[in-house]
């Protein structure tokens, strides 16, 4: 089997989807997990103002609202968490996303002081962080805050990982990649847009240029610049379409290089890294 087909199979991507069916599938998935573990009462998710967290947030709120209606248990809650590093340049998009999602509760945790304190402690130990590694520090601090909130609210941390992100490993290991449950897994980027459009999301939230915005030296660096391919390229690849050989090789390369990110910690029984 060609690598492209192996990847499509591993990530569960369909060449075509019914948006209503996929919305229902994700909502039921979240509900089923919470119903299986009745001691869990909240879904917790960081909201950045981008496409992925907006979609995951809306699906989470729909799931929680339905659970309350179906069970009569009013303790179920969706907690949206704003996690700016100082002042976020696209704060209006974040507020627009929250207005669309209508979360039960919004918490704001400014991670700047925590990141700077960590950087200072490392510097005193003789470790000077590069701008790139400092960016990963931000992502991990955001996830740490979400797990603290989840720990105090009987919660589950919801992730935003989707197929176009997974295939390239475009996430921080144990940062935004370190979550409990991923309702967007199997969808590529354009399919996520379709779900948001179907849900009535303001289009500027899913048409904006995707950026992780973690690096201070390269603020708002577009994902597509960092990856060297466009999301349309990646989506075509994941839908099984024939694409330019050079583009295909770049995507193949990202997948192979980042395999460790998609696996739990490597043990003596693993051998994928030897191949």
From Swiss-Prot:
Under Enzyme Commission nomenclature, its number is 6.3.1.5
Task: Write down a Pfam family by its short name.
Answer: NAD_synthase
Q: Which residues bind deamido-NAD(+)?
A: 140, 173, 180, 260-261
What are the GO BP annotations of this UniProt entry?
NAD biosynthetic process
User: So what family is this one in?
Assistant: Belongs to the NAD synthetase family.
SUBUNIT field: Homodimer.
| UniProt xrefs under CDD domains | NAD_synthase (cd00553)
Which pathway does this polypeptide act in? Answer: Cofactor biosynthesis; NAD(+) biosynthesis; NAD(+) from deamido-NAD(+) (ammonia route): step 1/1
Q: In UniProt terms, what function does this protein have?
A: Catalyzes the ATP-dependent amidation of deamido-NAD to form NAD. Uses ammonia as a nitrogen source.
By its UniProt entry, which PANTHER family does this protein fall under? NH 3 /GLUTAMINE-DEPENDENT NAD + SYNTHETASE, NH(3)-DEPENDENT NAD(+) SYNTHETASE
> Gene Ontology terms, cellular component aspect?
cytoplasm
Positions that bind Mg(2+): 52, 165
- The positions annotated for binding ATP are 46-53, 160, 189, 211
Q: Which UniProt keywords apply?
A: ATP-binding, Ligase, Magnesium, Metal-binding, NAD, Nucleotide-binding
Q: Give the catalysed reaction(s), semicolon-separated.
A: deamido-NAD(+) + NH4(+) + ATP = AMP + diphosphate + NAD(+) + H(+)
Taxonomy, superkingdom: Bacteria
Protein name per its UniProtKB record: NH(3)-dependent NAD(+) synthetase
Gene3D superfamilies linked to this entry: HUPs (3.40.50.620)
Q: Its Gene Ontology molecular function terms?
A: ATP binding; glutaminase activity; metal ion binding; NAD+ synthase (glutamine-hydrolyzing) activity; NAD+ synthase activity
């Amino acid at each position: 089997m060609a690598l492209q087909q192996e990847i499509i199979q591993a990530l569960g991507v369909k060449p075509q989807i019914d948006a209503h069916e996929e919305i229902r599938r994700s909502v039921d998935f979240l509900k089923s997990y919470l119903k299986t573990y009745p001691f869990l009462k909240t879904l917790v998710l960081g909201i950045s103002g981008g496409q992925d967290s907006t979609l995951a947030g809306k699906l989470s709120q729909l799931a929680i609202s339905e659970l309350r209606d179906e069970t009569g248990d009013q303790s179920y809650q969706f907690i949206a968490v704003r996690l700016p590093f100082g002042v976020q340049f696209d704060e209006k998009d974040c507020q627009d996303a929250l207005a669309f999602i209508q979360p039960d509760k919004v918490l704001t945790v400014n991670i700047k002081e925590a990141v700077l304190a960590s950087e200072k402690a490392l510097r005193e130990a003789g470790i000077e962080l590069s701008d790139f590694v400092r960016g990963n520090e931000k992502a991990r601090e955001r996830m740490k805050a979400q797990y603290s909130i989840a720990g105090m609210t009987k919660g589950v941390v919801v992730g935003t990982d989707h197929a176009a992100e997974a295939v390239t490993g475009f996430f921080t290991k144990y940062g935004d990649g370190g979550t409990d449950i991923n309702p967007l897994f199997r969808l590529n980027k354009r399919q996520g847009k379709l779900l948001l459009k179907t849900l009535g999301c303001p289009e500027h939230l899913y048409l904006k240029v995707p950026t992780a915005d973690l690096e201070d030296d390269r603020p708002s660096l577009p994902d597509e610049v960092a990856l060297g391919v466009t999301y349309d390229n990646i989506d075509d690849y994941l839908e099984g379409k024939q694409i330019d050989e050079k583009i295909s090789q770049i995507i193949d390369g990202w997948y192979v290089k980042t395999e460790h990110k998609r696996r739990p910690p490597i043990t003596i029984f693993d051998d994928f890294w030897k191949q």
